[in-house]
């Protein structure tokens, strides 16, 4: 699979209780214990490059910096944790009153990343990888995202979509 897929995104939401709450199997059991060793093996097979573990934070885990750091503590070096896209009526949807906490979490995460980097135990956090002088590459400026060209979402059932936000749209 490494020669066919240049970059792979592995879905894991962070701490066991957070992940298992949002990504259980059909019968209700959590998936964390099954996927973590497989994801670790995959990341190592790529020498910690050309992959991301990608999680989603929700109203239920506004302390998401703990999830990012948990993933780093598991040995992952390429990490992305993003805000949930949800209907405002969904219990897990982020709310306006969550914003001060979320802003603080990004500050905590940045400080911890600097500390770990100085200790030789750094990791990449996708949303902090910004070219402050040139902005996004020309391709990103023109297209906005990689949906359908450099990004593909695969559901647990094997269905393919150009982006995770399109899953279920037929």
Please place each PLM-identified region on the residue numbering.
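Conserved SAM/AdoMet-binding glycine-rich loop
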Residues: 1-17, 48
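A conserved non-catalytic segment of reverse transcriptases
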Residues: 6-9, 35-39
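Radical SAM enzyme [4Fe-4S]-AdoMet core and its adjacent flexible, acidic
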Residues: 17, 21-33, 40, 44-157, ...
């Amino acid at each position: 699979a490494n020669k066919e897929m240049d970059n792979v995104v592995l879905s894991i939401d962070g701490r066991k209780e957070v992940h298992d709450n949002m990504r259980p199997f059909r019968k209700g059991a959590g998936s964390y214990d099954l996927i973590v060793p497989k994801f670790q093996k995959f990341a190592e097979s790529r020498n910690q490059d050309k992959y991301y573990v990608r999680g989603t934070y929700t109203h239920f885990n506004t302390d998401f910096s703990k999830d990012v750091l948990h993933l780093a503590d598991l040995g992952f070096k390429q990490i992305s944790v993003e805000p949930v896209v949800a209907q405002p009526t969904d219990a897990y949807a982020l709310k306006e009153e969550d914003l001060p906490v979320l802003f603080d979490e990004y500050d905590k995460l940045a400080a911890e990343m600097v500390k770990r980097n100085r200790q030789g135990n750094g990791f990449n956090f996708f949303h902090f990888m910004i070219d402050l002088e040139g902005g996004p590459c020309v391709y990103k400026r023109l297209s906005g995202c990689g949906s359908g060209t450099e990004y593909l979402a695969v559901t647990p059932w094997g269905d393919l979509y150009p982006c995770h936000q399109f899953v279920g749209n037929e």
